[in-house]
Amino acid sequence: MLRPVDRQDSRFLRDMLRHAYHWRLAQDPELPVYRYVKNWGRRGDAGVVAFEGPNAYGAAWYRLFPASEPGFGFVDEETPELTIAVVPSRRGHGSGAELLEALLVRARSDGFEQLSLSAEPGQTGFYEKHRFRELARKDGTVTMVASL
């Protein structure tokens, strides 16, 4: 099942960052990647959490960034940037697709024209299946956008 992300989910979103980036993050809240969840609940923040019973196992969310502090997949100040992660034991069963599609619907209903993301080269196939296309390559990553 899915439900909207709320302020109480900020710790879970931080945990999901570790899965999204496929490498261990130190517990340093000043690392650049934590900008995706720091002070969750500001204007432009939205997301969905996948859960079964009391256990959450995945999340997809987006956040707007200012040009002065861009995210890794920054396009412009009007395009929210997507982050998505599912715990390893639940991957390959459609949870990511369900989360992503729900978030695309939410972004469209919130009036956004597109979403962006940053992916590693060779890790773009999932996003391409969900309307994302490559926009640019920089710093060893691929910036992708999906029109809504």
PLM region descriptions:
Residues 1-15:
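A short beta-loop-alpha structural element at the N-terminal edge
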Residues 5, 84-86:
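Hydrophobic adenine-recognition pocket in adenosine-nucleotide-binding enzymes
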Residues 45-47, 59, 139-143:
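Short hydrophobic/aromatic beta-strand or adjacent loop that forms the aromatic wall/cage
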Residues 51-84, 91:
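Conserved acyl-donor/pantetheine-binding loop and adjacent beta-alpha core of acyl/acetyltransferases
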Residues 86, 92-105, 109, 128-129:
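Conserved acetyl-CoA-binding loop-helix of GNAT-fold acetyltransferases
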Residues 97, 109, 121-143:
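Conserved active-site alpha-helix within GNAT-family acetyltransferase domains
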Residues 107-119:
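Conserved GNAT acetyl-CoA-binding A-motif
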